[in-house]
Design a protein with these regions (language model features):
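A generic "folded-domain core" signal
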Residues: 5-155
């Protein structure tokens, strides 16, 4: 499972405008992640679960800047999610209700764009064929990213 483990109760490191930073301990060491929710969601859906974006550092696993976007619904099989930041498009692959970039280089590029950007618009399509558009404010993202990087000693 690539999503953030819920085994240990996370500790809040801080809140930074639209983003919060968290830390918890696993057997192999610290895990730090930032969490944000869209400020606006558009779509003709009747029911939708929790929608959020996380960036996770797991130094013991040599994982850093792992971006995951949870849609609140099961994605259409084989569909991609698009994240657009100030005109630059990133394509993420989907598995059940979550989307990932797929490799460490692309994660780092997406995080760099999020740190430099103002707004991110994420579009996806549900298993039922419903299109969604979620808009995230990137205000506070850089501060939250610095906080998790410091807490997990990631450069």
């Amino acid at each position: 499972n690539l999503s953030v483990a819920r085994a240990a109760e996370p500790k809040v490191i801080g809140s930074f405008k639209s983003w919060s930073a968290h830390l918890f301990a696993e057997k192999k060491g610290r895990v730090c992640y930032l969490h944000g929710v869209p400020r606006k969601s558009i779509g003709k859906y009747t029911k939708r679960g929790e929608v959020y974006l996380q960036v996770t550092h797991r130094p013991a696993a040599k994982t850093r800047n792992e971006v995951s976007i949870t849609a609140g619904y099961a994605h259409k099989k084989g569909s991609d999610v698009k994240a657009v930041i100030d005109g630059k498009t990133f394509v993420l692959f989907t598995e059940t209700d979550t989307a990932w970039v797929g490799d460490a280089t692309s994660d780092a590029q997406l995080v760099a764009a999020m740190r430099a950007g103002r707004t991110m618009v994420v579009t996806g399509i549900s298993a039922r064929g419903t299109s969604t558009k979620d808009t995230y404010s990137l205000a506070g993202f850089t501060a939250a990213h610095k906080a998790i990087s410091k807490s997990c000693r990631v450069k």
